[in-house]
From Swiss-Prot:
Organism: Methanothermobacter thermautotrophicus (strain ATCC 29096 / DSM 1053 / JCM 10044 / NBRC 100330 / Delta H)
Matching Gene3D superfamilies: Periplasmic binding protein-like II, Porphobilinogen deaminase, C-terminal domain
Reaction catalyzed: 4 porphobilinogen + H2O = hydroxymethylbilane + 4 NH4(+)
A GO molecular-function descriptor: hydroxymethylbilane synthase activity
Additional facts recorded: The porphobilinogen subunits are added to the dipyrromethane group.
Known pathway: Porphyrin-containing compound metabolism; protoporphyrin-IX biosynthesis; coproporphyrinogen-III from 5-aminolevulinate: step 2/4
Comment on bound cofactor: Binds 1 dipyrromethane group covalently.
Keyword Transferase assigned: yes
Biological process according to GO: protoporphyrinogen IX biosynthetic process
Top EC class of this enzyme: transferase
NCBIfam families from the UniProt entry: hemC
Family, similarity comment: Belongs to the HMBS family.
Name the record gives this protein: Probable porphobilinogen deaminase
Length: 289
């Protein structure tokens, strides 16, 4: 069995984690194949200034469809909401923290007005503006190590990152502040992984054994909301699903780039009805997109 992956340190750690889990449920030996994506090649553009759908996944998905690899491991937030019908999300392992964190030498309240905040995320820019942080936004792309180095070297004063990536790489010492998800709401699927296969693959049932169903239902609701709204990186939308027992709560926030609150919704329902919960939240937000 061959697993396709991007070549970054984080992608390899994530793929190795999935391979370890699969090795406990599959007898086949699994090898990695590194595939470079368009997002890996383009480093000088803001994500929201281009069509970002499949930016970090398309080449891997094509390798799956062309049977060059048997599966691909993605950060679920990068997976398009309208996945190719010939592909399937075969597994969603247990989700890591979906939270956003501050990486900086100074804490959130101590960053002065005019501080340079590095980000290429319209959502993160909007949430900073919403909290009346008069930062100077600086484009910041690159892998996790590169972004941390630019903060530590003083090229920017701070950046906002996904806690999951830092934890997976053992870089928690760089976290200055962990934000509550209601204060700085993450991207859909943040912290989760997706194992992609062909929709007709015989491997789906065995790979699916590593799925963590509460995590799957959380991200299903989040991604359904995005799909129904047709929202992507060009839309400053934060959304988080939280499973508690057999119940699911979906919380979503839509801002303008300047940080004005357009709509905030909370929808609750049975965990098994995650897609319907996402659709209901989208219905409550559709007039504001």
């Amino acid at each position: 069995m061959i697993a396709g992956t991007r070549g970054s340190r984080l992608a390899l750690v994530q793929t190795n984690h999935v391979i370890e889990m699969l090795s406990e449920v599959c007898k086949e030996k699994i090898e990695k194949k590194i595939i470079k994506t368009k997002g890996d090649r383009i480093r000088d553009s803001q994500l929201y200034s281009m069509d970002s759908r499949g930016l970090f996944t398309r080449e891997l998905d094509m390798a799956v469809l062309n049977e060059e690899v048997d599966l691909a491991v993605h950060s679920l937030k990068d997976v398009p909401s309208d996945l190719d019908p010939d592909l399937a999300i075969a597994a969603v392992p247990p989700r890591e923290s979906p939270a956003e964190v501050l990486v900086s030498r100074l804490d959130w309240e101590d960053l002065p007005q005019g501080s340079k905040l590095g980000t290429s995320s319209l959502r993160r820019e909007a949430f900073c503006n919403h909290h009346q942080k008069n930062f100077k936004m600086e484009p910041l792309r690159g892998n996790i190590d590169t972004r941390i180095r630019k903060v530590m070297d003083g090229e920017v004063h701070a950046t906002i990152m996904a806690e999951a990536g830092l934890k997976r790489l053992g870089l928690e010492e760089h976290i200055k502040r962990r934000f509550p998800v209601e204060y700085f709401t993450p991207a859909a699927g943040q912290g989760a992984l997706a194992v992609i296969t062909r929709a007709d693959s015989e491997l789906i049932s065995s790979i699916g054994r590593i799925t963590h169903h509460p995590s799957l239902q959380e991200v299903t609701a989040e991604k359904t909301l995005l799909r129904e709204l047709g929202a992507g990186c060009q839309c400053p939308l934060g959304v988080i699903g939280r499973a508690t027992g057999n119940q699911l709560t979906l919380y979503a926030v839509l801002l303008t780039r300047e940080g004005e609150m357009l709509r905030k919704v909370t929808v609750r329902g049975p965990l098994a009805e995650a897609e319907d919960i996402g659709k209901k939240a989208a219905k409550e937000m559709e007039d504001y997109i």
